């Protein structure tokens, strides 16, 4: 057999307790349908992901105008297709119900599209391929939403990755991919079985790491970020949904 694709040469940690998801970990390439149907979350580190290559595209993100403050920068696009040949779907508002998002639910949020140059990068294609592999969707027919988000932490403004609080996104799968953490504290990713229960997962995702979440069974949240020095800090992530 030939060498496996680079994005599958990784250690995948199956869902477990808070701060220790899966203990020593289990090597996993392609989950079966039955295993996927039963999963809550999976944590993975992508090997040799060139996160620096996407930095210029995060530096060029516009301010999210739908929340108070200027700490969140954001783009959003919808796609079908393979990672190397994504088909951009018609531009649409991003709308969530008020039951899902109590902060911005019911608002037609019109975010700028992801830049064409980003789609051509191997690192970005690896992120998309990993999401497809572990969600087991058919990318030719299933719509993928891709949010590109930068949170800025400054001395004058706290960075809130999830100002809506503990929530679900209203999809089957959510993939949170950490691309960059620079000069910040906080930004822990939490997963919950219910909003009024302690988290079952609590971890700071490091660059190259991502967590796949069953959005039907779990809620998620990310804590506020603060700068660790005099200069602004940033947290860059891709959030993929299907």
Region roles according to the model:
Residues 85-145:
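Signature of the catalytic double-stranded beta-helix
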Residues 138-206:
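Catalytic core of non-heme Fe(II) oxygenases with the double-stranded beta-helix
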Residues 64-76, 135-149:
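Short glycine-rich, low-complexity/disordered patches
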Residues 1-101:
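N-terminal auxiliary "cap/dimerization" subdomain that precedes the catalytic jelly-roll/cupin core
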Residues 75, 142, 171, 185, ...:
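Residues that flank catalytic or metal-binding motifs in active/ligand-binding sites
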Residues 76-82, 147-149, 178, 214, ...:
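Structured loops at beta-to-helix junctions and adjacent beta-edge loops in soluble globular domains
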